[in-house]
Regions:
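Non-catalytic, conserved peripheral segments adjacent to functional cores
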Residues: 1-93, 108-111, 115-137
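Short, high-confidence coil segments that cap the C-terminus of an alpha-helix
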Residues: 109, 176-178, 241-243, 355, ...
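Conserved active-site alpha-helix within GNAT-family acetyltransferase domains
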Residues: 124, 255-274, 421-442
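A conserved beta-strand-loop-helix scaffold within acyl/acetyltransferase catalytic domains
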Residues: 140-202, 250-390
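Aromatic (often tryptophan-rich) hydrophobic motifs at membrane interfaces
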Residues: 184, 193, 228-232, 353-452
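Conserved acetyl-CoA binding element of GNAT-fold acetyltransferases
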Residues: 203-220, 377-388, 417
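A gly/proline- and charged-residue-enriched helix-loop-helix capping module
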Residues: 210-259
């Protein structure tokens, strides 16, 4: 029964003791009532054909119990409606704030007891159903006509980055079936979900083509709003797509302008399980640890070898860097970088201030490089690579120290990226040791799985 009830509604079974003297049920505060009780009232002597309720509460949650007799309660969250016949004094129904309800079909002699989370406040009711529906959350699937609105929201959100703007997301749109969602309340956009649909697997990914792609939210969003958005998103996925699985990559906290981990709680409440965990090395630029001596020695060696650091161009320098990178990946893993040269050039043309290449040059030869993604608060090394000459002469050490100490010294975090493979099952110990040598320590990039 509970699975078919609207958002947050729940049947509560109270303890029952029965002997030859009769039956006794009881409720002991928080053990049985999921809020602090601030008000208790009871309804009785309801004339035949009359109803009670017919409203929703802006803040108050209630537990409704038939102490005697029976009645039917209709609960409605604007998307789902259910009727429940209440006829056992040992059972109640939880009505969360924001759920419409009305009581009807009272049996003669019925007594209805109500526990409430807040004192009475006449201004805390919505009594008009049309007004109530206007207050409810609505969801729209993204299309190209909404690109400007999407990008504008990313920029004012508390956890969005340029990777979540459509100019970045859609560079490889042909590889994915987009099913990104936009959530509105009272006509205002309050949250967005970058997502793609894998029909053959019945799976929604948020997002399969991005390092992270969790819920993008406005600064005003609070925990209960995000719970509502998650419920709405899951309902939409099941109803519109027939999905039964959702893979979710939260946006790591370092990218948020203010705390924004309400989605992690919503994942827990939705029964999500941790599927993958990558470990990334990050420098807190306001509380830096010293570089290891081995990294300092590399910098000295690089300087003595005549290597110089400069911002690279996105033509010849990028091609030379990509060839070094591709050679390393092909040798170790038998694959090329995720992005081609032309894709990186396209993305740079769309985000010239966010995507930059820095190189270590020996005369005019590229011996090491770092492709940087700059979100304003966080600098992320999307790709790092060094030639054999560069490795022998500390080229990356000098390049990275220059970026950390000089070019991006005013940023909050410097993120080297993950050092794990196979969903986190394998840790490249040499790679993470190198990153930690610059004073970096770990955060995680997670993927959660929800089945429904």
């Amino acid at each position: 029964m509970e699975k078919q009830l609207p958002r947050g509604c729940k049947i509560i079974e109270f303890p029952l003791a029965v002997d030859d003297r009769g039956a006794l049920s009881f409720a002991e505060g928080a053990r049985h009532i999921p809020f602090q009780i601030e008000r208790v009232f009871w309804i009785y002597d309801v004339p035949e054909g009359k109803t009670r309720g017919g409203h929703s509460h802006c803040e108050t949650a209630e537990v409704v119990i038939p102490l005697n007799g029976s009645f039917t309660i209709t609960v409605d969250d604007g998307r789902h409606s259910a009727e429940v016949r209440m006829e056992s004094s040992g059972k109640g129904i939880l009505i969360p704030q924001g759920v419409w309800c009305h009581l009807h079909d009272f049996a003669p002699g019925t007594i209805c007891l109500v526990f409430a989370s807040h004192p009475y406040d006449a201004s805390g009711y919505i009594n008009d159903y049309s007004e109530y529906l206007n207050e409810q959350l609505s969801v729209v699937r993204y299309d190209l006509s909404r690109q400007t609105e999407w990008d504008s929201f990313v920029r004012i959100s508390k956890n969005g980055t340029f990777l979540l703007e459509r100019g970045y997301m859609d560079y490889h749109a042909a590889r994915f079936t987009d099913c990104s969602l936009m959530f509105y309340k009272k006509g205002n956009l309050i949250a967005m979900l970058p997502a793609n649909w894998k029909e053959e697997e019945g799976t929604v990914q948020s997002h399969g083509g991005l390092t992270y792609g969790g819920l993008i939210v406005s600064p005003s969003m609070v925990a209960i709003n995000v719970l509502e958005v998650f419920s709405c998103a899951i309902d939409w996925m099941k109803r519109e797509l027939g999905a039964h699985r959702w893979l979710y990559k939260p946006i790591p906290y370092i990218y948020s302008s203010i705390p924004a981990e309400e989605d992690l709680y919503a994942l827990f409440r939705s029964g999500a399980v941790l599927k993958e965990r990558g470990i990334s090395s990050v420098i807190d630029c306001s509380n830096r640890l010293p570089m290891r001596q081995s990294r300092k020695s590399g910098c000295v060696k690089a300087a003595k070898s005549g290597l110089r650091i400069e911002q690279g161009n996105m033509t010849s320098h990028l091609e030379a860097f990509w060839n070094i990178l591709a050679g390393i990946l092909n040798e170790k893993h038998g694959k090329n970088p995720v992005h081609t040269v032309s894709e990186l050039q396209l993305l740079h043309s769309r985000f010239p201030e966010n995507i930059k290449l820095f190189v270590a040059l020996k005369e005019e030869s590229v011996e090491a490089g770092a492709l940087i993604y700059d979100t304003g608060k966080v600098v992320h090394t999307q790709y790092l690579a060094s030639s054999e000459y560069g490795k022998r002469n500390g080229a990356l050490d000098l390049l990275l120290r220059n970026l950390i100490d000089d070019v991006y010294s005013d940023r909050t975090y410097f993120d080297f990226g993950v050092s794990t493979e196979d969903g986190g099952a394998f840790l490249n110990e040499g790679l993470i040791f190198q990153k930690e040598g610059f004073g970096a320590r770990s955060i995680v990039y997670d993927t959660y799985e929800m089945l429904f």
